[in-house]
Amino acid sequence: MASETETFAFQAEINQLLSLIINTFYSNKEIFLRELISNSSDALDKIRFESLTDKSKLDAQPELFIHIVPDKASNTLSIIDSGVGMTKSDLVNNLGTIARSGTKEFMEALAAGADVSMIGQFGVGFYSAYLVAERVVVTTKHNDDEQYVWESQAGGSFTVTRDTSGEQLGRGTKITLYLKDDQLEYLEERRLKDLVKKHSEFISYPISLWTEKTTEKEISDDEDEEEKKDAEEGKVEDVDEEKEEKEKKKKKIKEVSHEWNVMNKQKPIWLRKPEEITKEEYAAFYKSLTNDWEEHLAVKHFSVEGQLEFKAILFVPKRAPFDLFDTRKKQNNIKLYVRRVFIMDNCEELIPEWLSFVKGIVDSEDLPLNISREMLQQNKILKVIRKNLVKKCVELFFEIAENKEDYNKFYEAFSKNLKLGIHEDSTNRTKIAELLRYHSTKSGDELTSLKDYVTRMKEGQSEIYYITGESKKAVENSPFLEKLKKKGYEVLYMVDAIDEYAVGQLKEFEGKKLVSATKEGLKLDESEDEKKRQEELKEKFEGLCKVIKEVLGDKVEKVVVSDRVVDSPCCLVTGEYGWTANMERIMKAQALRDSSMAGYMSSKKTMEINPENSIMDELRKRADADKNDKSVKDLVMLLFETALLTSGFSLEDPNTFGTRIHRMLKLGLSIDEDESAEADADMPPLEDDAGESKMEEVD
C-alpha cells in the first residue's frame, strides 16, 4: 500500500542557492561526486563512532562501504552508503527547510566570482547534485526510524514519503541522480574511476563501482545447439547428414557479468614514508580531507616513537575559512584515528583554539579504541600528543617563514591566530613572538619582525616602542609619535584589535621591555640641557596646568607638561596598566561586555600639554592675565575634545563639539553672533546665565 506523500517548501536561501546552481554555467560540474562521497564518508564515520560503544548499531548492516552504480538504461547514477542514515526529521531539516550558516556566505562567494567547487567548505555540498541531475531521489534508513524517500526536481519544493515497497537498505543512504541529457558522461566507467582517483582516493572506506564485465567464452556448436533449443523448437528443419558428420566446430560468444570493483586501494598515506610521497599525493589527500578546492600551503608529516607512538600529517591551508572564529561552530580540523580505525573528527582536545586553522590526521597506537569524548578530556596520552602537535605546528610555521612570499600569504590569513597564541599559550609564547610581523615607522610598506626591530635599535635604546590603534593610517601621524620620531626611535604599529590582548601578555622580547607610546611611563633619554629646559617649562606652565585641571574637573586625573609631544598642542595618555584608547574602543564595541569592568580598567586620562606650541603659549598668557576669562575655558574644552580624537578616544557628545567648532568658524570669519542668532536658535549657548561654560558639560 502506497504511503502518504508530504510536500515541503525549500527554505528561501536554499531555493536561491538551487536556482544559482541550476541556472549558472559551471565548467567543473564533476565536483558533485566528490561532495556526495564526502557526505557518505561522514555518515560512515558517525555510525562507526556510535558502534564503538554499542556494537548492535551495526547489526542491520555490518559492512561499511560506499557503492557507486551507473545505470545506462535509466540514465541514473546512484551513490549508496551504509552510514548512519537519516531519520524523517533529519531529511526534512537537513535537505531543505533549515539553511546552514554557510548557505548565504557561499552564495556571496559565488557572486564575488568564487569557484563552485568551494561548496563543501560551506556545508551545502549535497546541493551540488543539481549541477548534473534534473531530479534527485534520496532513500534513507536510520536505526531509529523507518525507511523514507526524499525527492525533488528543485522546483521550490520537495516530497518525503515513507518507503514500504522499495528495496530495503537495512541502514544507510542511497542517492539516485536522474542525469541531465548533456551529463551522461558520468555513467561511463572510465570517467567515474578517474574522478574517484582524482578527488576521493584517500577516503578511508572502500568505494566500489558496479562494473560490467564482458568475457569471451568458447563453446562448441553442440553446446550452442543446446542453448538454442528453446528458440528452435517447433521449427521444421532439413538436416544435412553430411554436415552432422563433420567435425564439430568451436565458436566464441560474449558473456556479460557484473561485479563490484574497489577503486581506492591505497593504504593510508600516513603509514608511508614521507620521502616516498609526492607533492601531488599530499595535495590529493589534503583536498579529500578538507573539501578545499585549492592545494595546501605547507605540510608536516612525522611520527613520534618511544614511550608513546603516533603518526600525524598536518596541513596549513592557503586561506582562512569564512567562519574561522565562529565560536558556535566546532572546527572540523584534526581527524583522530586509533590503530588505523577512525574515531572522531573535530577532536578539540588534540589542538588548542589558536591552531584551529591547521588541518590533518593523527593516528595513535596507544589510545583505547572505545575512547569517548569524556575520557579524552582526562587522557594523559592525548595531552602528550597535543603538546607534540603544537610544537610541530610552530616548527612548520618557521619553515613557511623561510620563504618570504609564502609567509606573507600565511601571515595575512592567520596572523590573528598567532596573536591569539601569544595570549593563550604561555609555553610557546616566546617562540610565537618571533613569528609576529608589524609595520613600523621605518618599515615602509614591508612588515618587520621583532627580531629585526631589535637589530635596528639605537645605541643605548633598551625598550621596544609600539603604538596601538584602529589602522596604520590612524596611528602614523599620531601626536604620541612626534618625540620618538624626532629622536630617531622606531615604533611598531599594532593596529589589529587582537594586538591589544597579545601585547598585554607579551611584556618583553629578548629581554627588551615593550613600551606603549600612548601610556604613562614613556621615558626617553635626555641630555642635561634638555632636562634643564624641561624643568624651566614645567615651572612656567604650572599655572596653566592648574587652570586646565579646574576647567576639566574629573575628566582628567592630572595635567602635566609633556616631553613626548613636539608639534601638537596636547595629547591624552592613559595609565601604564589600564586600557589604551584603542582597547577602550574595542571593549565598547563588544555587545555582551561586562560594563562593571570598564569602570576600573578604563584608567583616568592624563592631559599632557606641549609648552613649545604657540596655541598653548597664548593660552598660558590669557590664563595668567585672567583665569576666569571665558575664552580660556572654551579653548580648554575644545583642546580637550580635539585631543580625545587625536589620541584615539571617542567623543561622548559629538554634537556639542560640532557646535563649538561652528562658533570658532564664525569668530574666524568675523560673523556677528546676533546676525546668525535666528539660525542658531537650536544651538546650545557657549555660556549659560551663571557664566559657566556650557562646554564643560561635554563628557
UniProtKB/Swiss-Prot annotation:
Subcellular localization: Cytoplasm
InterPro entries attached to this UniProt entry: HATPase_C_sf (IPR036890), Heat_shock_protein_90_CS (IPR019805), HSP90_C (IPR037196), Hsp90_fam (IPR001404), Hsp90_N (IPR020575), Ribosomal_Su5_D2-typ_SF (IPR020568)
Residues given in the record as ATP binding sites: 39, 81, 126, 373
UniProt KW keywords: ATP-binding, Chaperone, Cytoplasm, Nucleotide-binding, Stress response
Gene Ontology biological process terms from the UniProt entry: cellular response to heat; protein folding; protein stabilization
Motif (TPR repeat-binding): 695-699
Chain intervals for the UniProt region annotation (Disordered): 215-250, 674-699
UniProt GO cellular component terms: cytosol; perinuclear region of cytoplasm; plasma membrane; protein-containing complex
Predominant cellular place of this UniProt entry's protein: cytoplasm
A Pfam family that the UniProt record links to this protein: HSP90
SMART domains xrefs: HATPase_c
Entry-linked SUPFAM superfamilies: ATPase domain of HSP90 chaperone/DNA topoisomerase II/histidine kinase, HSP90 C-terminal domain, Ribosomal protein S5 domain 2-like
Segments of skewed composition (Acidic residues): 674-690
Compositional bias ranges of the Basic and acidic residues kind: 228-237
PANTHER family noted in UniProt: HEAT SHOCK PROTEIN 90 FAMILY MEMBER
Family per record: Belongs to the heat shock protein 90 family.
Protein name: Heat shock protein 81-2
Organism field: Oryza sativa subsp. japonica (Rice)
